[in-house]
Regions:
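Short helix-loop-beta junction
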Residues: 8-19
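Glycine-rich beta-alpha loop elements in corrinoid/cobalamin-binding modules
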Residues: 5, 24-174
Length: 174
């Protein structure tokens, strides 16, 4: 999430009595990076950052970018392709059964089936590919506080279905 957006989300959560730890641009190859703060009480909130990771990593000509404007020192190569998916995968490896919510620009833009420029295919929702429990899209401050309150009550993220600005899994029967 962009610094201002991240600060706003953290500010809102902390003002409402929640404790927040930020793991900014972790080494996605090392699962221990995701264990450094311990298992959270409510869950993980995952964002690829201020920009879609594929746009951040590649030019329109599909060439790797030499700089990353949103990485420390502007150095490219610290953010994986499809960062939301990779981060959720590492969290699932580190902690089985923990609530994982995704949001930010990458999740918002890929919440439904979408054309993927880099593979020239139509891909399904990032919620399905990432295996997160819940997707928040758009400006998520209000939904974030509502979801945090539900998680605090003990409702698993996969069962939250009444919050505006979210996407969730459903079966064909539903």
């Amino acid at each position: 999430v962009a610094a201002a957006d991240r600060a706003r989300a953290v500010e809102l959560l902390e003002a409402n009595g929640y404790t927040v730890a930020i793991l900014a641009q972790p080494d996605y190859r090392n699962v221990e990076e995701f264990r450094q703060f311990g298992q959270p009480k409510l869950g993980f909130l995952v964002s690829a950052g201020a920009m879609d990771s594929m746009v951040s990593n590649y030019t329109a000509n599909n060439k790797p970018r030499s700089e990353d404007a949103y990485a420390h020192g502007g150095v490219a190569g610290h953010r994986p392709d499809r960062a939301t998916n990779i981060y959720v995968q590492k969290i699932r490896e580190a902690y089985k059964g923990v609530n994982v919510l995704i949001g930010g620009i990458e999740a918002s833009l890929r919440r439904t089936s979408h054309y993927d420029y880099w593979t020239n295919t139509v891909k399904r929702s990032i919620l399905l590919d990432s295996k997160a429990d819940l997707l928040m899209y758009g400006m998520g401050e209000h939904s974030l506080l509502e979801i945090a309150a539900l998680l605090r009550e003990g409702i698993p993220a996969r069962q939250i279905r009444n919050v505006r600005g979210t996407c969730w899994y459903t079966s064909r029967k539903e």
